[in-house]
Curated annotation (Swiss-Prot):
Lineage of source species: Bacteria, Bacillati, Actinomycetota, Actinomycetes, Micrococcales
Keyword NADP in annotation: yes
Description of how the protein assembles with itself and partners: Homotetramer.
Obligatory cofactor(s): FMN
Protein's GO biological process: alkaloid metabolic process; nicotine catabolic process
Enzymatic reactions: 3,3'-bipyridine-2,2',5,5',6,6'-hexol + NADP(+) = (E)-2,2',5,5'-tetrahydroxy-6H,6'H-(3,3'-bipyridinylidene)-6,6'-dione + NADPH + 3 H(+); 3,3'-bipyridine-2,2',5,5',6,6'-hexol + NAD(+) = (E)-2,2',5,5'-tetrahydroxy-6H,6'H-(3,3'-bipyridinylidene)-6,6'-dione + NADH + 3 H(+)
Pfam families, per the entry: NTP_transf_3
Described function: Catalyzes the reduction of nicotine blue to its hydroquinone form. Nicotine blue is the name given to the compound formed by the autocatalytic condensation of two molecules of 2,3,6-trihydroxypyridine, an intermediate in the nicotine degradation pathway. May play a role in preventing the intracellular formation of nicotine blue semiquinone radicals, which by redox cycling would lead to the formation of toxic reactive oxygen species. Besides nicotine blue, several other quinones are reduced by nboR.
Stored PANTHER family: MOLYBDENUM COFACTOR CYTIDYLYLTRANSFERASE (PTHR43777:SF1)
UniProt key word Protein transport: no
Protein name: Nicotine blue oxidoreductase
Top EC group: oxidoreductase
CDD domains documented for this protein: GT_2_like_f
């Protein structure tokens, strides 16, 4: 499949969290590769093949916009961010054109690469969800579903109807596992996100 055959995809970058456990302010502003996590992730999604990127901000949204260069992207502010990731998912989904697939990524997953994004887009099949998956040292043959993931345009309303609280698309994925294609991205990343101070210092 050539680049011109790729589906029209809106990247949705969930970046609304406050990062309270880390004590460093929003995770979006953590330093990474000489800039912020949100800048790195958004550019990776765009270069990887997304036609546009919608960044969903929440906690300290004004500070994030002031400190990060987000001009190439569309910004959506989720004022209900404290209710959980579900509200941010819905805000990003609503901002994307209804005919577009969406590629959902998390700002606190620094292992996101251009190769991973491109691999998911090329692998995507109509009417399905393509999810990055990662092996672990304990079970290298077992793939663990993670982010990012491509959600087909035709499935977006059904997925959105199941979203609440902090679950995001998790409920739908558990209800309809036969619609999910796991795409092995273990060669690019462990799929871990930044939740602890130890992980943060490894990032720095």
């Amino acid at each position: 499949m050539g680049d011109t055959d790729l589906p029209c995809v809106t990247g949705v970058l969930l970046a609304a969290g406050a990062g309270k456990r880390l004590g460093r302010g929003p995770k979006a502003l953590l330093p990474y590769r000489g800039r912020t996590l949100v800048e790195d992730a958004a550019e990776t999604m765009l270069v990887g093949g997304c036609h546009e990127v919608v960044i969903v901000l929440g906690a300290n949204a004004q500070a994030v916009c002031a400190r990060a260069n987000l001009e190439p992207y569309r910004i959506v502010v989720n004022h209900d961010w404290s209710s959980g990731m579900g509200s941010s998912y819905l805000a990003g989904d609503a901002a994307a054109h209804t005919k577009n697939h969406i590629l959902v990524a998390l700002v606190d997953q620094p292992g996101l690469s251009v190769t991973t994004v491109g691999r998911l887009l090329v692998s995507h099949r109509p009417g399905r969800i393509s999810s990055a998956a990662y092996s672990s040292l304990d079970s290298p043959r077992v793939l663990r579903r993670g982010h990012p993931m491509v959600i087909d345009a035709g499935l977006r309303p059904a997925v959105a109807s199941t979203v609440s609280g902090d679950a995001g698309a998790r409920v739908f994925l558990r209800q309809k596992p036969w619609l999910v294609d796991l795409i092995d991205c273990s060669d690019e990343s462990t799929g871990e996100d930044v939740d602890t101070v130890e992980q943060m210092y490894r990032l720095l």
